[in-house]
UniProtKB/Swiss-Prot annotation:
Catalytic site: H190
Catalysed reactions, as listed in the record: (S)-malate + NAD(+) = oxaloacetate + NADH + H(+)
Species of provenance: Janthinobacterium sp. (strain Marseille) (Minibacterium massiliensis)
Binding site for NAD(+): G12, A13, A14, G15, Q16, I17, G18, N108, Q115, V132, G133, N134
NCBIfam families: MalateDH-SF1 (TIGR01759), PRK05442.1 (NF003916)
EC number: 1.1.1.37
Name by which UniProt lists this protein: Malate dehydrogenase
Length: 329
């Protein structure tokens, strides 16, 4: 018997990431090749943005996707998020020239407060929310705090792009396929302070750390390359990474819904106090997922260098949180 369609809401749907994302969701990449979907697409109430969204929907229609059970355009989160099973919060205020980080935080806090309240009011009680729009961790925290009637665990931030970037750098370094590498993680904030950590990683069951055996490469090449990859792409292409971000969003939600078969992935999730990270801080952790529920991988040894890096990214997150506290009432 055919499955009932799942409702997937996407914000910033006419943007660059949206354009790379929507066709893949409609093709079954997000929720599985037997799961029909209804797309509920949100864009700002600006005539140009709404017109662009109509154009995107025309193209989606023209693909005649077998799994697509419907697609609707919205300018109001209260209708876009109605009964949503999955919400991908992609739209965010980008940092403009001369804009301080503080201004960026405040501008986004307003957007994510409104969206959190709308999710709280109308989304499915089991909605899985992924925040892609930056600063992703703090935006997810704001949305979560604005939705007191939804479980905090429903709100996540995307660190999968950082995870995938780290994975490909390691695969290239040790000349192994990415599929052979397991137990990699990225701790902390989706920002250059993140800490990609391969101390526990294996390739075909053998230690990656021993295979690389180069602390100088780790500190001087690997960490900065992964941490500043977004800036390097802007420098090369003139625009920010969209297709790779969309791909990471698909990976994150697919694994959250369909499970990871015991494999580690990285998700930005509300802390339960593990590894000394204050409760409710949205932080990148190694997790496994089963039956739609993620669990933090426990019992990992944190050496002095790792603790220093984790403290650094946590400090930044707590500063961001402090910067938006007055907006959360």
């Amino acid at each position: 018997m055919a499955k009932a369609p799942m409702r997937v809401a996407v914000t910033g749907a006419a943007g660059q990431i949206g354009y790379s994302l929507l066709f893949r969701i409609a093709n079954g990449d997000l929720l599985g090749k037997d799961q029909p979907v209804i797309l509920q697409l949100l864009e700002i109430a600006d005539e140009k943005a709404q017109k662009a969204l109509k154009g995107v929907i025309m193209e989606i229609d023209d693909c005649a996707f077998p799994l697509l059970a419907g697609v609707t355009a919205h300018s109001d989160p209260m209708t876009a998020f109605k009964d949503a099973d999955v919400a991908l919060l992609v739209g965010a205020r980008p940092r403009g020239p001369g804009m301080e980080r503080k201004d960026l935080l405040e501008a986004n806090a307003q957007i994510f407060t409104v969206q959190g309240k709308a999710l709280d009011a109308v989304a499915s009680r089991n909605v899985k929310v992924l925040v892609v729009g930056n600063p992703a961790n703090t935006n997810a925290y704001i949305a979560m705090k604005s939705a007191p009637n939804l479980p905090a665990k429903n709100f996540t931030a995307m660190l999968r792009l950082d995870h995938n970037r780290a994975l490909s750098q390691i695969a290239a370094k040790i000349s192994k396929p990415v599929t052979s590498i397991e137990k990699l993680t990225v701790w902390g904030n989706h920002s250059p302070t993140m800490y990609p950590d391969y101390r526990f990683a294996t390739a075909d069951g053998k230690s990656v750390k021993e295979a690389i055996n180069d602390e100088v490469w780790n500190k001087d090449v690997f960490l900065p390359t992964v941490g500043k990859r977004g800036a390097a792409i802007i420098d090369a292409r003139g625009v920010s990474s969209a297709a790779s971000a969309a791909n990471a969003a698909i990976d994150h939600v697919r694994d959250w819904v369909l499970g990871t078969n015991g494999k580690w992935v990285t998700m930005g999730i509300p802390s339960d106090g593990s590894y000394g990270i204050p409760k409710d801080t949205i932080f990148g952790f190694p997790v496994t997922v089963e039956n739609g529920e993620y669990k933090i991988v426990q019992g990992l040894e944190i050496d002095a260098f790792s603790q220093e890096r984790i403290n650094l990214t946590l400090k930044e997150l707590l500063e961001e949180r402090e910067g938006v506290k007055h907006l959360l009432g």
